[in-house]
Regions:
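A short beta-turn/strand-edge loop motif at beta-sheet boundaries
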Residues: 64-69, 129-130, 194-202
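Long, internal scaffold/assembly segments composed of regular secondary structure
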Residues: 205-226
Length: 226
C-alpha cells in the first residue's frame, strides 16, 4: 500500500511577519501608468495563479500620456522567497524569449474625457511560454526610454493536478479565549504525493495568506509532526 507522508502545521498566526512582501505585490513605477489589472484564467477574483498547461494570465494597463510607447516585458523565474533563480537559464523556464518581447495589443481611447492608451498582454503567447512551475516576476519597461521600468507583476505557475502535492487547510476555533477575537488558528496538512521529501524544513516552503494579502503572510510555520 502506498501511504502518502504528511506534514502537519498548527498556525496560531495572525499578527504575521512582513517577509518578502514587496516582491509579491504588483507595483506601478510610473505615475502615468494606471488601471493595472492582472487576471488569471478570466477570473478577476482569483489570485494570479495559473496552471503550467492550459492556464492564461492577462495583464492590462492604461498610459495617460496618450503617446505611443514601445513597451516590452521581461519574464524572470524566482525562488520561493521571490529572489531570481540564479541557477536557471532563461531557456530552462521559458519557451521562446524571456525578454525583449513587445506589447502589441494597443488601443487608443475614443470620446473619453481623459485621453489614454490601453495596453494588453497575455501569457503564455507565441513569443513567450512558461515551461516550469514556480514564482514569476513580469517586468514591463519602455524601450523608447532607456528600458525604464514602469510596472512589475508577480504571479505563480503550478504543476498539473496529478503532479501536485496535496494541501488541506482547516480553521480551528479552540484558540485561547484571550486572543480568539483578534487572531485565527489554522491547521495545514501537506501530502507529499509522489515527491521524495527527506527534510521537510528545507525542501518545503509554506505560506498562509489572510484575504490574499502578502504583507501579513505567515511563512514556514514549524510542523507539529511529520
Amino acid at each position: 500500500m502506498n501511504i502518502a507522508k504528511r506534514l502537519a502545521l498548527g498556525l496560531s498566526a495572525l499578527t504575521l511577519g512582513n517577509i518578502a512582501a514587496t516582491a509579491q505585490r504588483h507595483e506601478i513605477l510610473d505615475p502615468n501608468i494606471r488601471s493595472l489589472q492582472v487576471i488569471a484564467d478570466n477570473d478577476w477574483r482569483r489570485m494570479p495563479i495559473i496552471g503550467l498547461r492550459g492556464g492564461q494570465l492577462s495583464v492590462s494597463f492604461d498610459d495617460l500620456t496618450h503617446e505611443y510607447h514601445r513597451y516590452a516585458y521581461r519574464l524572470t523565474h524566482c525562488e520561493a522567497n521571490w529572489k531570481p533563480s540564479e541557477a536557471l537559464f532563461e531557456s530552462d523556464y521559458c519557451d521562446g524569449f524571456a525578454s525583449g518581447n513587445t506589447i502589441d495589443d494597443v488601443q487608443e481611447s475614443i470620446l473619453t474625457n481623459t485621453l489614454y492608451t490601453h495596453y494588453r498582454l497575455t501569457l503564455p503567447n507565441g513569443q513567450c511560454a512558461m515551461k516550469r512551475s514556480g514564482n514569476y516576476l513580469l517586468t514591463i519597461y519602455d524601450e523608447n526610454d532607456d528600458d525604464r521600468e514602469v510596472a512589475r507583476i508577480a504571479f505563480m505557475v503550478t504543476e498539473p493536478a496529478e503532479a501536485q502535492m496535496g494541501v488541506g487547510l482547516k480553521v480551528l476555533t479552540n484558540t485561547d479565549a484571550t486572543i480568539n477575537q483578534h487572531h485565527q488558528q489554522v491547521e495545514m496538512e501537506v501530502g507529499y504525493g509522489g515527491y521524495r521529501v527527506t527534510d521537510p524544513q528545507r525542501q518545503i516552503t509554506t505560506v498562509v495568506l489572510q484575504n490574499q494579502r502578502w504583507d501579513d503572510a505567515r511563512w514556514n510555520a514549524r510542523p507539529q509532526y511529520t
